[in-house]
Amino acid sequence: MPFQTPPPVSAPVPSISAPAAVIGAPVRAQYGWGYAGPDGEGVGTLSLLMEAASGRLVIELHAPGERLLLLEGDSASGYRLQVPRQKVDQRAPYLAQLPLPFLPQVLSVEGLLHLLRTGEGAGVSVQKKDAQGPLKLHWRGKDPRGKDEQVWLDRKRWEEGE
């Protein structure tokens, strides 16, 4: 019988709410999105592709007729954030170094997955749940200027696996 070596101490701890078979597998999700803040209000669609194992992340936020935000990258090559309306085009080696306009701030892809799977995060409340987890989320926080803003997410699609 071959010996198994334990995982390195730095290995991420799997989420309790995620089945063991899908830890690290890609997660595709889509949410209805609503926003209220100092610069106005808006609605749209938030689409995400998340891979915790590689740190790969693609986020697209669309309002009717325009893309508000595109964030893509992975933990090996870094992340790029584009916000055309605000003329933002930023790169950073770590997700935590990028401001996420119109969304709650997260430190990592694992943190974003945890927030969406459990509804746990600073300023986040779960308004409705189903068997898969939070169906409707509400976030209340501050923008980079210290002004109040709110985001509502209504899950439309959640797919785990290849």
PLM feature spans:
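N-terminal leader/targeting segments and the immediate start of mature chains
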Residues: 1-47, 158-161
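Polar alpha-helical coiled-coil and adjacent low-complexity
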Residues: 16, 24-26, 49, 94-104, ...
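One face of beta-strands
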Residues: 27-33, 42-50, 55-61, 77-79, ...
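Hydrophobic lipid-interacting interfaces of membrane-associated proteins
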Residues: 32-38, 64-66, 84-87, 144
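Short, solvent-exposed secondary-structure boundary motifs
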Residues: 35-41, 58-64, 113-120
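Short, exposed beta-strand/loop patches in secreted or surface proteins that constitute
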Residues: 47-51, 71-72, 123-130
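An acidic-aromatic
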Residues: 54-107
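Gly/Pro-enriched, hydrophobic low-complexity segments
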Residues: 113-162
